Structure formats: structure tokens, C-alpha cells
Amino acid sequence: MTGLNLVITIIQDRLHMPLVSVIIPAYNAEDYISQCLSSVLSQTLSDIEVIVVDDGSTDRTASIVEELTHRDGRIRLIRQENQCAGVARNKGMEVAEGKYLYFLDADDWIEPDSLEKLCSSAESLGSDIVVARSEGFDNQTGETWLIDYALNGVPFDTLIRPSFYVDRLFQRFMGWPWDKLYRAEFIQSSGLLFQPLRTTNDAYFVFCSLMLAGGVSCVDKVLFHHRANNRKSLEGTRSKSWHCAIEAMWAIAKKIAEQPESTRLMESYNNWVLNYSYWSLNTLPADIADLYLEELAPALSAMPNGIESYVSRHEWTLRTLASLNQSKLLVKATDLSGDRENLSHEIANLQAEIARLNGELDSLRGELADRDSKIREVYSSHSYKLGHALLTPLSAVKHRGK
């Protein structure tokens, strides 16, 4: 190859835009990064670039990735000081050249045809975002399960306009990026970035992109595997960064206020805040949970009182109880305890009444059985058979006489 031809080849390579840019933020993921990258590099869709942004790892993560770059030219390694996954994803987007963006966590992995399925849906339907089903994997037990609370009540293999899901956006989709493919041009025009937060840094980007998308399509197939119960994951240390979720909530609420459908979006958002907060209060240490609830108080007080504004009584009850101060909550808890005791007595009385009625029913069944037995005895007696034999001819004569 001449020098000129080599230059032309290099220029052509640089001008070629891969179909998908896979962006992987990685922090101390030496135990999982090889499996993650192997699942990406073995995709049936080969026209991809893989951008790994090492977020200041202190283990062998970066060196493992660097070794792989020598084997596969589609991998790029970017290093940065530890600034969190949100900043790492933004860094990856800055250099991404693909028509589509896919964000994968360094401890997760994907099915061999994941990117092909996602791109096929996006290309055929013109989607700004494509979402597919995912499966959870317990890192301690090896248990797997379908994440069936994602893609809740959505149609598949068709273009969904925001008008379909705007009033239940936060219930139909989850606030993580790894089950979604994004059209890069759409993300660039939206100006959306991941928040620079230690945890919950993806919720703002994901939910706001769903608000702004021209159309979303969904694939009814498990394409992603999400590792849970990973002790090295930052999600396992949320007590150190509980405020990040609050910051994400406030940013999302601000974005909602700018939208034409803000009223419908806010109703869905309120229900999400309540359920997410219920999970947080249930999983955070008690002292941290108190701080969380204190920070959330302004949002709770702004939520409507009527039960019709909530997905179910569960959310309405959460809002009602969480918005009470300590003294009112004590009174409410005492009242509920009394109500529970009264209901227990009512249940006991009803059970006793059911037992009494069952006893009467058994007695009636016994009487009916006795009568049936007596009737059978009559039919089988000699006197009945003799009488029946004598009367039968007379009945026949009487019938002919008519």
C-alpha cells in the first residue's frame, strides 16, 4: 500500500460513522468488565464503537480494557479522575460518533442480538428511543428474574407517541438507561446530559428524554442482564449519597414545569416520587431515612389531597402519612392501631358466625341424607314392589279408557 493509499484508508476510517456507540462508565469493575465487553464485542451487529470511560478505578479495570483495545480496534479507553458515572457517560457522549447511543453498566451484559434488535426497531419505526425487556441477576445467589415492572402496559413493535404515555410516563418506564437505545441526533438537539451525582445520576436524563422524544418503540424480548446485589456497586452505599435522589427529583420537576403537558406529567411524577421514596425509606438506615423525609417535605406538601390524583390507594396513603408531622402521625398510628383491633374483633365474630352457619348446613345435609335413605328403603321394600305390581295393570287400563 502506497503512502497516499494509506492516508486515504485512514481518512475513510475516520469518516465512517458507526451505527451504534456503546458507552460504558467503569469504576473498579475488574471482576465483571471482561464479561461485559465480551457480550458487546460478540454482537451480531458489528458496526459499533465501544467507548469505555474509566472513572478513576483503583483496581485493574483500566488495564484490562487497555489490553482488549489491542485485540479489537472498536474499543476506545478514556480515563478520568473519579467523578461518578454520570460525568463518565457525558464524556463518552462527547466523543461518540454513532448514529445511536447505548449506555451499558460495566457489571452488566447483553444478549448477542441486542443491538441488532434495537437498531432494527429504531430504523423501521423512526424511534428516538427504543426500550426492551431486561432480566435481573443476583450476584450473591445466582438467581435470575424478569424485571416485569418495566414496560408496564405499553404496546410492542409500534411507534408510541408521548401522548399515549404522558400521564403514566414514570410508571410505564424505569429511570435507568441500560434498557434503552437513543438516537444520537435527538439527544444532541435536546441538550440533555447526565447529572454529576454520585448515585441516581441517570434518572433526570432518562425521564426527560422520554418527555421530549418524538416517538418510542418497545421490543418484547429480554435483551439485557442487570447485576443486582453487587457489593462493589455504589448502589450498595446509598446511605452516603441519599440526597442525590432528592436532587434528581427537583431537577426533573423543574423540567416538567417547562412542558406543555406539565399537569399530566406532574401527576405521574408525584406517584413515582412516592413509590421511590417508600423504597428509600424502607432501605435506608432510620436516621438517614428521617433526613430524607425532611428534605422531601416541600414536595409532599405540594401534592394534591384527593385520592383521584394517585395511581392507587397505596400512593395516596403514602402521601397522607408522609405529610403528617410527628404528633399527627402518632395520633394517626394510634387510631389505625385501634381500627386494626376493632377489625380483628369483627373478623373473629364473622369467623364464629361462619362456623355456626357451616354447622347448620352440615345438620341440614344430614337430615336430607336421612330422608333420601328412608325413601330408598321404601322403594326397595316388598310391600312397595307388590303394590306397584298390582297397580300397574290398572293404570294401563285407565289410560286406554281415556
What do these predicted regions represent?
Residues 18-21, 49, 204:
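Cell-envelope/extracellular polymer assembly enzymes that use nucleotide-activated donors
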Residues 85-88, 106-219, 224-241:
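Donor-binding/catalytic cores of nucleotide-activated saccharide
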Residues 101:
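Short aromatic/hydrophobic "clamp" motif used to bind/position activated sugar donors
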Residues 29-42:
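Short, well-formed alpha-helical segments that are part of the catalytic scaffolds
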Residues 80-96:
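Glycine-rich, basic loop-to-helix element that forms the pyrophosphate-binding segment
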Residues 320-402:
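Boundary detector for helix-to-coil junctions that initiate low-complexity/charged tails
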Residues 47-56, 76-81, 106:
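Short beta-strand/loop segment that forms part of the nucleotide-sugar
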Residues 39, 54-63, 81-82:
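A conserved acidic beta->alpha catalytic loop
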